[in-house]
């Protein structure tokens, strides 16, 4: 049996939302199962039309509502020598790509996951990074406003 385009579109309405703090919700309840949360982060992608999806492959995906249109949050940061190490909402860690750090108004953002995604930098993480800001620069890079 082949599904119509309308039936497929209806099935893609997942009811899953990613909030501004990096928490997944389904039909009003927070997703708390560690394994399921990890899978949802692995499947996170963006369609060419700009809509957020949870993708298994080119044909199998569902729509994802993302609050604020930025999926990742930098929850904390620490310094290892001259490198800032970020802890993201998916519990992964990666070095800050300093050249991607920018401000939108007063809110700091950077690129994560090899530059694939924007991430909002939390207040806690920003305070750690700000310890090394000198004359509007972090590690020699000017922090632009966009």
Tell what function each PLM region has.
Residues 1-146:
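Terminal leader/tail segments of proteins
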């Amino acid at each position: 049996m082949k599904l119509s385009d309308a039936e497929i579109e209806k099935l893609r309405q997942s009811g899953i939302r990613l909030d501004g703090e990096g928490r997944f919700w389904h039909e009003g309840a927070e997703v708390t199962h560690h394994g399921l949360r990890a899978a949802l982060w692995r499947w996170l992608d963006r369609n060419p039309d700009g809509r957020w999806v949870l993708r298994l492959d080119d044909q199998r995906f569902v729509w994802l509502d993302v609050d604020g249109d930025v999926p990742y949050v930098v929850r904390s940061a620490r310094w290892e020598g001259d490198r800032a190490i970020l802890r993201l909402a998916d519990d992964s860690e990666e070095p800050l790509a300093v050249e991607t750090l920018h401000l939108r108004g007063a809110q700091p953002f950077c690129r994560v996951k090899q530059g694939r995604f924007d991430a909002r930098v939390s207040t806690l993480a920003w305070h750690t990074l700000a310890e090394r800001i000198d004359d509007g620069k972090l590690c020699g890079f000017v922090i632009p406003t966009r």
